[in-house]
Amino acid sequence: MNKRKILVPLGDKSYEVTLEAGILNNISEELLKIGITKNRKILVISNEEISNLYGEKFLNNLKDNKFQAKMVLIKAGESYKNLKTLSEIYDVAFEFGLDRNSIIIALGGGIVGDVSGFAAATWLRGIEYIQIPTTLLSMVDSSVGGKTGVNHPKGKNLIGAFNQPKAVFIDPETLKSLPKREFSAGMAEVIKYGVIRDKELFKYLEIEKNKNELINLKNEYLIKIINSSIKTKSHIVSQDEHENGVRAILNYGHSFGHVIENLCGYGKFLHGEAISIGMNIAGKIAIEKGLWSKEELERQKILLESYDLPTEIPKINKEDVLTILMGDKKVRDGKMRFILPKEIGAVDIYDDVEDSLFLKFFS
């Protein structure tokens, strides 16, 4: 049996991530197992692309099992992860009569999950929600850990809340319909876990046979890397739910990744692609500070590129880079903090990086 369960231990906010091929087809059964009783109202938040693939079957499964279910579709893309979209969800929630006993289900990628989680955190001061991620990036990263929110014109995820889901259900079968570029973008986050905490995962990803099986979307191989990634994230989140300390290492590559997304315009690079470039920049800074070797930087670069991820730094204005970085959530007391690698499998947080050390990488 290829069903995996991973506990995210957070006291009274603990929940399980269930990972199984085909679980989407038995969603009502899974909801009943975690205590979601029949006749409860369920608002499913998704987007048009995912709805066309799974929406009708998913809703019918819920309704056939006596759940009161309705679906609301939000527009795909980072530019729609905003307060206007949130307000549209509230309108539907009001019309549907979503009460405190109701539940929201996020069926989609990271944007759907982030917006749904924040809608759940704020509707009637908080109702339960469930994550059902359908992209690799959301499976291994954003669906676990409780970070929810929307963007503001001044920056990504500036409006949000920590809101842990009631459960997460992951079906690797949904990756079969994912565009190849989106799959590669998700691999950036998987490789990130290898660099920050799991050198065995990193080595596994370097093996040619594994690489081919992953690119060909073989469930057994997908389940292994998703399981490893979530275990790492779960362990870190359980130590530091609200990112006051060690959880910041999950942002390896993200500070510069957000700079690139912002300054190149949301949409030019997928999130995972920007993170890949950000990891390359962080790796270069680590060389400058004598933290790790050129060989390790090269291993990281080769691995990223082998999954069709970009590593080349785009041409952007140095002054703009500093402006965006100073608005980063990891800034403490006016000091920028960077996650830098010490070796494959270990990183640390540094607040003593001179501007000149990284600005030279931007033209």
From Swiss-Prot:
Its EC number is 4.2.3.4. It comes from the Bacteria. The keyword Flavoprotein does not apply. Pfam families: DHQ_synthase, DHQS_C. Zn(2+) binds at residues 189, 254, 271. Binds 1 divalent metal cation per subunit. Can use either Co(2+) or Zn(2+). It is an enzyme of class 4 (lyase). It catalyses: 7-phospho-2-dehydro-3-deoxy-D-arabino-heptonate = 3-dehydroquinate + phosphate. Pathway: Metabolic intermediate biosynthesis; chorismate biosynthesis; chorismate from D-erythrose 4-phosphate and phosphoenolpyruvate: step 2/7. Belongs to the sugar phosphate cyclases superfamily. Dehydroquinate synthase family. This is 3-dehydroquinate synthase.
